[in-house]
Amino acid sequence: AYYGQNFNGEGTMKLLYGEYPGQDFNFPYMAPGWSPLMNNQSTITQSSSSIYDSYPWYYYYLIIGNANAVINRIDKAEGSQEEKDFLKAEALTFRAYSFFRLAELYCEPWARSNDGATDGVVLRIKEVAEAGEETDLKLSTLAETYKQVYDDLDEALRLYEVSGLTRDDIYWDATSNISFPDAPVAHAIYARAALTRQDYAVAKEHAALARANFPLMDTNTYYSGFCTPSSEWIWGVYNDASETIWYYGWQLFMACNGYYAQQNINVCINRDLVESFADSDIRKGLFLTESTFLPEDGSK
């Protein structure tokens, strides 16, 4: 299948698959051409033969394939053992995240899985060049999928620790290193996966470890637009001036002054929902309402 500019990796995953339209998030019908697609009301997004159905599968297995190549070859690469341990840990983190996201998108929820007995995903953990006849794999169970996620993250966390390095040490000269995983990122993915698996004690443990050095943002930062990493931002999509995702950047769609907003493709919240917020509710300040720009007496 051909995936065009609409499909640009994690930006697309967050925009089309990570946000489910509802009263708090909706593309109004005045948004020309985009509303049915973005609101998941189009037959295009509902069809099992659609590229919108297959793209996450293609995208995450592409990451898994790259991760397998790193895991398989890193020991023979040049560099210190500490650097190689860290890079292998990153590859394991990416692979665990990808298996987890595939399970979220293509598998039954854990609550309906008969304790993980339903179908999981294909667990490709060998590089194709090394797999031989093992390339034609069957689906795992959902329990086996989550076990692989846990195993990858356990090994990643072990390697992060023995390396003694952080992403600041490895990517010290990068414009931004927020997109590169390290131990806190692995803990965060572990927490999300465990929460989705209803493994609540494990989720609580790893969530605390993930957040340890990421204090919550203050009110001013909360209202600053979410366009740059804040103190509580653990992991994010790579972006700098030389490598952007152009038309499908999150803020191009979501920001009130973004490109698509200027083309009358605005994201909105249901009026009844936003008016139900108390004036003291910090979320209310994120939305433009009549009271935002009209005099209190309602005159124009």
Model-predicted regions and their roles:
Residues 154, 160, 183-184, 189-217:
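Aromatic-residue-lined binding/catalytic grooves and analogous aromatic/hydrophobic interfacial grooves
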Residues 6-12, 17, 38, 162, ...:
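Hydrophobic-face positions in mid-chain alpha helices that act as interaction patches
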Residues 80-84, 161-177:
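Short helix/loop segment immediately N-terminal to the Walker
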Residues 105-147:
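Short coil/linker segments at helix-helix boundaries
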Residues 103-110, 164, 196-198:
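Short coil/turn linking the two alpha-helices of tandem helical-hairpin repeats
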Residues 31-107, 136, 140, 158-161:
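Conserved, well-structured interaction surfaces
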